[in-house]
Amino acid sequence: TDSEPGAVILGFKASMTDVYAFPMTIGVRAHEPSDVMSKVRALEPSDMSKRAVAGMKEFYVRAEGIHGTDKSPVITARMKPVHSIGSVRAHFIDGKPTPIKVRAFGPITESMLDEHSMTIGRYEVIASRKYPSDYRHVFGMETSALDRVYAIKGEHRAFSDVSPTHATIEMESPAAHDFLYGRAKVDEPMTIRVAFHSTCM
C-alpha cells in the first residue's frame, strides 16, 4: 500500500549537468507509471524537472551525512510533491510530524547516489524542539540549545534504527523555485524543513 515504506516505485535519473542543482534520482509513482516514464524520457532536460514533478504522486529523497560514508546518518523521505512559486513543499503520506530544518549544501558526487534518492554530501540540522534520545543518536549526540532551537551535529550513525517514512519535508530558499525547475547552482544553499514521526522501528 501507499503507507508501506517498501512500496515499489519506478525511477528516473537526472544528472547535475541536465536538470537539478545536484545529482539526484527520483522515483515516480503514478496511476499510469509507464505513461509517466515515457513522457519523462521524451522531455528535454530543461523541461524534465517541472513536468515530472507535476506528474508524480510521491518521490524519495535521501540525505547522507558530512563525510558521505557508510557511517553517516541518513534521512530517507517518501514525499508527495506540492509546489508553488518560491517554495517546494512535500508532505509525507502519513504520520505525526516533529519539525526540524535541514540546510543542505554541496558538493555531491555520483558515488553517493542510490536509486530513488538524493544524497547530500554535507548538511546542518536545526531542530525546532528537543528530540527524544533516539533521534539525537541518529543525528549525533552533541546538541546545543539556542532558546527553543537546537543545532544537532557530531558523531555519525546509520538511520537504520528509526523509521523516517512518517514526516513532512519543506524545501524553501531564494533558489528553491529555480532548483525545482533546474536552474539553481550547485553551491547555493537550500533550506529543507523536515518533520519526523517519533516512532522507532
From Swiss-Prot:
GO terms for MF: nutrient reservoir activity
Domain of life: Eukaryota
Keywords associated with the record: Seed storage protein, Storage protein
Name of the protein in its database record: Arachin 25 kDa protein
Subunit and interaction comment: This is one of six apparently different protein chains that constitute the peanut protein arachin.
